[in-house]
Amino acid sequence: EMYQCPVIFMPDLQQGLNKQSVPSFDLNRVPINRGKMMKEADLPALEQPKYFKRFELTEDGISPRTIPGMKNGLFLSTGLEHNEEGKPAEAPTMHVAQTDKRFRKLETVADNYEPFLNNAKYDEADVLVVGMASSRGAIEEAVAEFDQEGVKVNHLQLRLIKPFPAKQLQPFFDAAKKVVIVEHNKT
C-alpha cells in the first residue's frame, strides 16, 4: 500500500512443507499505511479535460493517489509508458523521467525498510553467515556452538532481496575473513 507496488512472498521448502499449530494472528497489531492517499476535500477542482496527476514525478518516486470514483481524482491507467496524468506518452524525455521515478521508488523502499536481521556481535568476524527464510534457526544454533568454541561468527538474515541491500551488506562482508551463504536448495 505505502509503496504502491506488488509484494511477492517467497516461502521456502521448509515453510511450504511444515505443519504447525500457531495462535491466530492479531491483525489489529499491524497498522496498514495507505501512503499518499488523497482525500476528496484536498483535491483541486479539475477543469475538463484535465486529469489528476496519478503518476506525478516526485522526489521519492511515490505519487499521490486517489480511489477510483473520487471527485476530481480522475486519471488514466494503461500498460503503455505514460505522462503524469496516465495518458500514453512516447516522448523519450517522459520515458526517462518515469523510469527514473520508478528507480527512486526502489531507493525509497531500500531507505525505509530494514532489509535484514542483524545478529552481528563482532566488529571483525572469522565468519559471516548469511541466510534467509527458515535457515535462521539452524544458523543461530550453529553460531551459538561456534561461540562456545571461540570462533567469532556474525549472522545476517535477509528479509528483502529486491532491491538487494548490497550497500548495507558490504561493511559486514568486508569485516569478515570468510562469508558463508546458507540456502535451502541444490545450488
Where are these regions (language model features)?
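Flexible, low-complexity linker and terminal segments
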Residues: 1-187
